[in-house]
C-alpha cells in the first residue's frame, strides 16, 4: 500500500474529530440542528487551520441521511461518497486554477438544476479571492437569489480581496490559528495511533515551528519521522 501523508490520513471527517475552532463548530452544529441554514458560508483563516476540512464536514452534515445534532454519521451513502470524492451533488473548485468567468458560469448554470442524490447541491470554492472581477459579478446574482437547493461554502486566506458585495451575502467565520499545545497534543495522538515513539519536547518544538497550522505541523512530523 502506498504511503499516505499524515495530513491526508488524519484529516478530520466529523466535527467531533476537529482540533480547535470550537466557536465555528458550535455555531454550525446549532444552525444544522435547528434548521437555520444560510445559503452561503465564508471560512477565512491562514493556511492549514481547517477551512477545507470544515467545508467538507459541513457538506456531509447538509446531506447526511442520519445526522444527529448536526454531526454527520459517516456511514450513510452520502457521507461515504463525500469522503471518497465521488458525491455527485458536491463540487469542489480551486479558484486559483479556475479564475475566469467561464469556469464560474458553468457552475452557476449547473446550480439551477435540482440535486441528483442529496437534499442540497454544495459548492466548495477554495481560495475564492483568486476569482476574477467578472467571475465575482457572475456569482453575485446567484448569491442574491439563490435556489433553495444550493449551498455555497467559500474559503479564503485573504478575505480583504473578496468584494464587499460578496462578503455581505455570506455568513462569515474566522478560523483561529492552533495553539502550540493543541498542535503538540494532536501530534501525540497521531503518533500513538501510528505506533511511533516520540519525546514530548520534540512535539512542542514542532508545534511552535508550525506557526498555528495543523497541516504544516503534520508535514513537519512526516519529515521528522523520515529522518
Enumerate the predicted regions with their spans:
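P-loop/Walker A NTP-binding region and its immediately flanking N-terminal helices
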Residues: 1-172, 182
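Conserved AAA+ ATPase "SRH/arginine-finger" region at the nucleotide-binding site
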Residues: 94, 172-184, 195-197, 208
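Short, polar/flexible loop-turn hinges at active-site or ligand-entry regions and domain interfaces
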Residues: 66, 194-195
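C-terminal helical "lid" of AAA+/P-loop NTPase domains
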Residues: 123, 188-192, 202-209, 215-227
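A conserved short alpha-helical segment within the catalytic HATPase_c
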Residues: 108, 184, 188-191
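Short, solvent-exposed loop/helix junctions and linker helices
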Residues: 98, 177, 211-214
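Non-transmembrane, interaction-prone segments in cytosolic or luminal domains
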Residues: 64, 119, 149-150, 179, ...
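Short hydrophobic/aromatic segments of transmembrane alpha-helices and their interfaces
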Residues: 7-8, 186, 199
